C-alpha cells in the first residue's frame, strides 16, 4: 500500500530544504514527489518513473539530490536533458531549492562558449546539460564522471525521439559503475525499457497518476473550416496557451493570419535566431502574446505553469507527442483544456492515441 504524504514535513527533509520549499510556495507534494522523494532518499534502488510534463517531477529528484550531494566532494550528480532550455530550467529549479547549502551547479549545453563551462566544471557538484556538449567535455578531458553517485535521465522518450540514446549510453559508460540511476519519461517505449534493463538491473518502477486537471476534447470539422474553428476557440478573452502545428511554415502562416484579424499571436520556429526565440518566449511569459504557435520540436523547453489551454491545430505524429503537448496545461494544480481540431479522416488517428494512452477524449459540441 502506498503512503500518502500530506505535506513536505512528513518526508524527513532538512530544515534548509523545507524553508526553500516554503519560499517557493509549494504547499504539498505532488503524486510523483510523494512517490520518488522517500524512495530516492531512503533506498539504494535505481528508479524508473513515468511522469508527464507539469507533474512536479523536477522537484522530485532535485530535492533528494540537494540533501544527498556533498558540496566538498566534486561532481557527484549529473542530469541529462534533451534540450538546453530544459537544462536551464532544471538547473534553476535546483538553485531555487538548495537554500543555504553551498552546492555549485554547472549548466553545460551547446550554443555557449566552452571555456566558461570548463571553469564552472572545476568547482561543480551537480552538472546539468545536454548529451552532445556533455560528451564534448568528456572527450576533451574537462569533465570527469568517475565520482558520480547519481545519474538522472530526464525526458528519456524525448531523448529517443531526438536521436540521443547512443550519446546517453556513452555518458553512462563514462560514469562510476556504482552510481544510482533515475530515469524519467512521460511514456515508456520499448527502447526506453530496454535501456533501463541494460544499465539499471533491478529498479523500482513508479507511475504518476494521470493529470485529472486536463479536460481533453476534440472538434470535428471539414478541412476548409479548420482555421474558422480555431478562431472560434481563441475568441475566449481568457485564452492563454499553445497552438501546435505540423510544420515550421504552418506556424509562420497561422500566426500571421491570426495577427491580421487582431489576435495577439506569436510563432516560434527554426528560422528564428536564439535571441529572437528568447524574445518571443519572454513576451509570451509576460502575456503580451497570449497565443503561441509552435511545432513539437520548437516547443521543447517552454516552461509556463499557468497555460489554460493547448490546441492541436494538427494532430501530432504519435501518442507520445500528444502526451508531451497536453502536459503543457493543467500544471501546478490548475485546471487546463486540451482541444484537438480534426477532419473526418483523422478520427481514427485520434482514437488510436486515445487507446494507446488510455485516455478519454470527448467530442466538443460546437453549436
Curated annotation (Swiss-Prot):
A motif (Q motif) lies at residues 6-34. Keywords: ATP-binding, Helicase, Hydrolase, Nucleotide-binding, RNA-binding. ATP binds at residues 51-58. Its EC number is 3.6.4.13. Residues 38-206 form the Helicase ATP-binding domain. Transmembrane segments: none annotated. Pfam families: DEAD, Helicase_C. Residues 213-367 form the Helicase C-terminal domain. Belongs to the DEAD box helicase family. Homodimer. This is Probable ATP-dependent RNA helicase MJ0669. It comes from Methanocaldococcus jannaschii (strain ATCC 43067 / DSM 2661 / JAL-1 / JCM 10045 / NBRC 100440). The lineage of its organism: Archaea, Methanobacteriati, Methanobacteriota, Methanomada group, Methanococci.
